[in-house]
From Swiss-Prot:
Pfam families: ATP-synt_DE_N (PF02823)
Family: Belongs to the ATPase epsilon chain family.
Name of the protein described by the UniProt record: ATP synthase epsilon chain
Gene: atpC
Annotated compartments: Cell inner membrane
């Protein structure tokens, strides 16, 4: 199967660069699946999971806090404020941050910061999904 070059960059560092068979990411208008030779595209992406298949068939998962996706026929670039490999996520820290976000939503009720609190909770849930998906992928490799 054909491949293309994928680069995932956070504000701090390059997280991944290599040849992949496909990538799945959530754009602002829905889910995107990118294969080699895809039509050029530039779109914002939502906080969530970037899942891609390596040349050897193994899959990897990276959490992104949102950002931009640029697609060229043989090159795909993800630019994110924050990007963390699923294998580097800490489940305990995620659960604690999720719990605090839920408590803040309940305690503040209809406060003006409600949308920000919901966005924080959504990011923690996306991190949790990235962690769980990574764990599942690691178990299937064993």
């Amino acid at each position: 199967m054909a491949t293309f070059n994928l680069t995932i960059v956070s504000a701090e560092q390059k997280i991944f660069e290599g040849e992949v068979k496909q990538i799945q990411v959530t754009g602002v208008e829905g889910e995107l699946g990118i294969l080699p030779g895809h039509t050029p595209l530039l779109t914002a992406i939502k906080p969530g999971i970037v899942k891609f298949t390596l040349k050897d068939g193994n899959e990897e998962v990276i959490y992104v806090s949102g950002g931009f996706l640029e697609v060229q026929p043989n090159i795909v670039t993800v630019l994110a404020d924050i990007a963390i490999r699923g294998s580097e996520l800490d489940a305990d820290r995620i659960h604690e941050a999720k719990r605090k976000a839920e408590e803040n939503i309940v305690s503040r009720g209809s406060d003006a910061d409600h949308d920000l609190l919901v966005a924080k909770l959504s990011k923690e849930l996306a991190k949790l999904r990235a962690y769980e998906l990574t764990e599942k992928l690691l178990k299937t490799r064993r």
